[in-house]
Amino acid sequence: MLWLLFFLVTAIHAELCQPGAENAFKVRLSIRTALGDKAYAWDTNEEYLFKAMVAFSMRKVPNREATEISHVLLCNVTQRVSFWFVVTDPSKNHTLPAVEVQSAIRMNKNRINNAFFLNDQTLEFLKIPSTLAPPMDPSVPIWIIIFGVIFCIIIVAIALLILSGIWQRRRKNKEPSEVDDAEDKCENMITIENGIPSDPLDMKGGHINDAFMTEDERLTPL
Amino acid sequence: MAHAPEPDPAACDLGDERPKWDNKAQYLLSCTGFAVGLGNIWRFPYLCQTYGGGAFLIPYVIALVFEGIPIFHVELAIGQRLRKGSVGVWTAISPYLSGVGLGCVTLSFLISLYYNTIVAWVLWYLLNSFQHPLPWSSCPPDLNRTGFVEECQGSSAVSYFWYRQTLNITADINDSGSIQWWLLICLAASWAVVYMCVIRGIETTGKVIYFTALFPYLVLTIFLIRGLTLPGATKGLIYLFTPNMHILQNPRVWLDAATQIFFSLSLAFGGHIAFASYNSPRNDCQKDAVVIALVNRMTSLYASIAVFSVLGFKATNDYEHCLDRNILSLINDFDFPEQSISRDDYPAVLMHLNATWPKRVAQLPLKACLLEDFLDKSASGPGLAFVVFTETDLHMPGAPVWAMLFFGMLFTLGLSTMFGTVEAVITPLLDVGVLPRWVPKEALTGLVCLVCFLSATCFTLQSGNYWLEIFDNFAASPNLLMLAFLEVVGVVYVYGMKRFCDDIAWMTGRRPSPYWRLTWRVVSPLLLTIFVAYIILLFWKPLRYKAWNPKYELFPSRQEKLYPGWARAACVLLSLLPVLWVPVAALAQLLTRRRRTWRDRDARPDTDMRPDTDTRPDTDMRPDTDMR
């Protein structure tokens, strides 16, 4: 009798948990990819932990606080490591709706990942999209800060250059004497404008007959 | 000609003094920096790759020797001799040719508009490189946070960052969209940097050029060393440099080589004329021309090696990822243990599985992974820098550092070219005396930079990239070729070959050899005529552009669309505008002469003046004919 009951139970379980069954989810783990040398082997103890995590997630759902580890059924464990699981109700006759299981897993995905040292890419619940981490948005984007710094430096540099240019010009205007010495060398200077010497004498201001002045300067080197 | 052979007219620099380079190195670096630009990094390697690898160097060298160096020499020589910017130089050669100078100024203005926009994009990427992880490394999640944004999912994180988060591009050129504020402030910053460096002309440029011209070489060396140590680099180099001689039979190769050498040396901008005009007249411009052209050439090669080794790494990386994805599909579907199929075993395993479970394998999304396919994927222009390189950069350890170095290099390269381009606009304006004498030079440069910045804001619109491509294709290419052609013809045939050789003999101490004379007289104009014809032929095809349209069925491929009527009109206008100055100026000059002749004739009715006498250009604008 007991044997019959046992077979019946396993048969029912087998029906409930099957690849592609209603409310069943496929899980895929990539332990070696995630951990490399430190990868652990997937054995029944790990399966037990998995069942415990799923049960834990379900218990957080209102109305499902009575979920036990035995309500979570695993099947078709492959070498990949992948398997299917379903969560049954306390009567163990029906499986809980996929929507509930999905939302429960989604809310606790982080805890489940951490229990196995995996992340969203290496512990995949096919058909349950994981909630992506919110993008790290600092209140002020970094590029604006750097831009602000650089722009301020540029503005200061421009201001300094303009100011130094103004000072230089003021200094030059106050020293016309230096200009006179150079005029002697300038006799041969010919510009494009029809051979009239260029006019450094403008610096002296006033109305001066330039041609006359040039002659004068040449003859009186003092 | 302004300065007849007389003792040292340059010694007299007074109130009107023309600024001078502090030393020869500044001048050489400025010309080199102007010549070496973004094109050396992202255009030459692409051409090399497309046109048969090492074999492309043959037409390239031939074009350099017969076209690039001779025209370059002409520009440096006339700038140095006549000591004026492009407008002054051409007015001095012949008043009827003053349009060439005006055309150069207009062209440089148009080019500076879009070139600095590219520099602004580079600046934006540079600013965004100061974070880890880099913003283009992953797609942003969508609203429910269940997956990634659809556009990003369909293309790639780097493409999404470029087209959406940087440009925010519209799907059509008709749809202008709004101004993107982040691009606008980057553009403002770029123009501020340019202003800061050209504020007092070569006085300030000469100081900055030490950094902006040399820093790219430093970074290229670092990238070269790094690139050669990356896995797959040698495969990239071998594949990309292996010469494919058959491709030389395609005439396109020769034409593209010639146009590339042309733009690469930044000829016909007027920038080299401007720079050379600040030289002392007795400078060996012939040696300078050869040296700078060769340095530019070597830089292109050097950059290609660095670029190809990085591309080889990328191709190998992509190939391995492709294999890995296929292997994962197999493992997941058949539930094999993890990492049970290595990359080498994959073909055998696939064959075996295909034999035993053909239907199941056929359903899997397996892609054919061939290394050559990945190596063949070439990109040029902004696509290389902002999409291909950023993606490669993500795979290199220490990604933000490499990104900073790369974009820093592009920024300084673009900047040094901008100096030449802006100087090509400012020097003629200064010479012509657009603003009164009491206005300081800083104000003029500021005004020019402000006008350029305001005009360039159209490129910060959402459709800005499409407009930039229009400017690049239609404003630059045809005009540069036609203006260069007019330059050579103007100097050789209007100014006179003999007089030009005499001037060069006076400046450099030796007469130009027959090579120079032959290339100036015959080869360069001939080549240029061919290119102009080629460019015109290009226009006969319907004008198309490639749009980024997320709703396109074949997304992420770009959708080919025709330019609307008004855009086509803009294309034509841009390609004609600078060159139109030539006939307009010549006509204006003719009319002025005629009017003067009539006026003189009316004032002195007894003198028997033949109208021709006055229309001869020599009497007015060449005072040295009186001096000789």
Swiss-Prot record, chain A:
PTM entry text: Glycosylated. Glycosylation is required for plasma membrane localization and for its cleavage by BACE2. Proteolytically processed in pancreatic beta cells by BACE2 leading to the generation and extracellular release of soluble CLTRN, and a corresponding cell-associated C-terminal fragment which is later cleaved by gamma-secretase. This shedding process inactivates CLTRN. Three cleavage sites have been identified for BACE2, two clustered sites after Phe-116 and Leu-118 and a more membrane proximal site at Phe-125; the preferred BACE2 cleavage site seems to be between Phe-125 and Leu-126, Phe-116 and Leu-118 act as alternative sites.
Collectrin-like domain span: 21-222
Domain-level remarks: The cleavage site containing the double Phe-Phe motif acts as negative regulator of shedding by BACE2.
One GO MF term attached to the UniProt entry: protein homodimerization activity
Signal peptide: 1-14
Membrane protein topology class: Single-pass type I membrane protein
Pfam families attached to this UniProt entry: Collectrin
Protein's gene: CLTRN
Protein name: Collectrin
Keywords: Cell membrane, Glycoprotein, Membrane, Phosphoprotein, Signal, Transmembrane, Transmembrane helix
Family: Belongs to the CLTRN family.
Tissues with expression: Kidney; collecting ducts. Pancreas; beta cells of islets.
Cell location: Cell membrane
Chain's role: Plays an important role in amino acid transport by acting as binding partner of amino acid transporters SLC6A18 and SLC6A19, regulating their trafficking on the cell surface and their amino acid transporter activity. May also play a role in trafficking of amino acid transporters SLC3A1 and SLC7A9 to the renal cortical cell membrane. Regulator of SNARE complex function. Stimulator of beta cell replication.
Swiss-Prot record, chain B:
Keyword Transmembrane: yes
Record flagged with keyword Transport: yes
Ranges per topology, Extracellular: 48-51, 112-178, 231-253, 312-399, 466-474, 541-568
Residue ranges annotated as Cytoplasmic topological domain: 1-26, 75-88, 202-207, 277-288, 423-442, 498-517, 592-628
Key words of the record: Amino-acid transport, Glycoprotein, Membrane, Neurotransmitter transport, Symport, Transmembrane, Transmembrane helix, Transport
Gene Ontology biological process terms, A to Z: amino acid transport; neurotransmitter transport; neutral amino acid transport; renal amino acid absorption; sodium ion transmembrane transport
Primary location: membrane
Membrane topology: Multi-pass membrane protein
Cellular compartments annotated: Membrane
Disordered, as annotated region: 602-628
Glycosylation sites: N144, N168, N174, N354
Gene Ontology MF terms in the entry: amino acid transmembrane transporter activity; neutral L-amino acid:sodium:chloride symporter activity
Tissue: Abundantly expressed in kidney, but not in intestine.
Gene Ontology CC annotation, any one: plasma membrane
Annotated TM spans: 27-47, 52-74, 89-111, 179-201, 208-230, 254-276, 289-311, 400-422, 443-465, 475-497, 518-540, 569-591
CDD domains, per the entry: SLC6sbd_B0AT3
PANTHER family associated with the record: INACTIVE SODIUM-DEPENDENT NEUTRAL AMINO ACID TRANSPORTER B(0)AT3, SODIUM/CHLORIDE DEPENDENT TRANSPORTER
Illness association: Genetic variations in SLC6A18 might contribute to the disease phentotype in some individuals with iminoglycinuria or hyperglycinuria, that carry variants in SLC36A2, SLC6A19 or SLC6A20.
Its biological purpose: Does not show neutral amino acid transporter activity.
Family indicated by similarity: Belongs to the sodium:neurotransmitter symporter (SNF) (TC 2.A.22) family. SLC6A18 subfamily.
Protein name: Inactive sodium-dependent neutral amino acid transporter B(0)AT3
